[in-house]
């Protein structure tokens, strides 16, 4: 899975999948990382990775334009600057204005980036990708809801107030250990004003 040394095969993999799902209602995730939740292969420095990602975005949107809708700006799309991809984004990666930027937490419950006024004004808007379960480096938390519901509430309220309102995605892993955090997140996504009015203690 290497767009530097194996681009034709990777492109065909993407193309085949886009053709398979073109008639369905989808949100297409743009971009590329590596295998096993790691950084992309074939590009070592942030500058090299940025150049590859720019090519990836162009080629992926070309596929969407070809197989889904000639007006690519009308297709729901998301770009997720997760982990090392945030460094590439901060190095000046240009993401098309119609693409939703999905910001992430640091795997400990704290959101790493809030949209600037310029990012808030984007046509694609802003979203969040948040974890209540995590498998990966530096360590995992899979079987216990390990952080306070008040932290989740505080971070989601902050996200909403700073313009992260287009799309909320929650990584839940196994449902049972984090049932309450999941319920709180979904209730805030559905009607944040009601949760804010009653407070977390009453919501519990």
Give the role of each language-model region.
Residues 2-123:
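Gly/Pro-rich turn-and-neighbor structural signature
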Residues 103-109, 115-204:
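Structured mid-domain segments that build the active-site/substrate or prosthetic-cofactor binding neighborhood
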């Amino acid at each position: 899975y290497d767009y530097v040394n194996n681009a034709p095969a990777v492109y065909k993999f993407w193309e085949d999948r886009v053709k398979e799902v073109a008639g369905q209602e989808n949100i297409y995730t743009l971009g590329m990382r590596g295998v096993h939740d790691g950084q992309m292969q074939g590009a070592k420095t942030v500058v090299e990775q940025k150049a590859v990602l720019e090519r990836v975005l162009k080629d992926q949107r070309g596929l969407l334009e070809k197989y889904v809708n000639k007006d690519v700006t009308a297709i729901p799309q998301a770009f997720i600057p997760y982990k090392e991809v945030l460094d590439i984004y901060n190095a000046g990666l240009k993401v098309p204005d119609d693409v939703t930027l999905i910001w992430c937490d640091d795997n400990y419950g704290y959101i790493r980036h809030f949209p600037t006024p310029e990012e808030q004004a984007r046509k694609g808007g802003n979203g969040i990708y948040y974890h209540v379960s995590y498998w990966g480096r530096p360590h995992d938390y899979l079987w216990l809801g390990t952080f306070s519901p008040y932290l989740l509430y505080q971070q989601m309220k902050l996200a909403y107030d700073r313009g992260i309102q287009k799309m909320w995605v929650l990584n839940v892993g196994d449902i049972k250990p984090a049932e309450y955090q999941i319920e709180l997140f979904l209730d805030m996504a559905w009607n944040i004003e009601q949760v804010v009015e009653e407070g977390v203690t009453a919501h519990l």
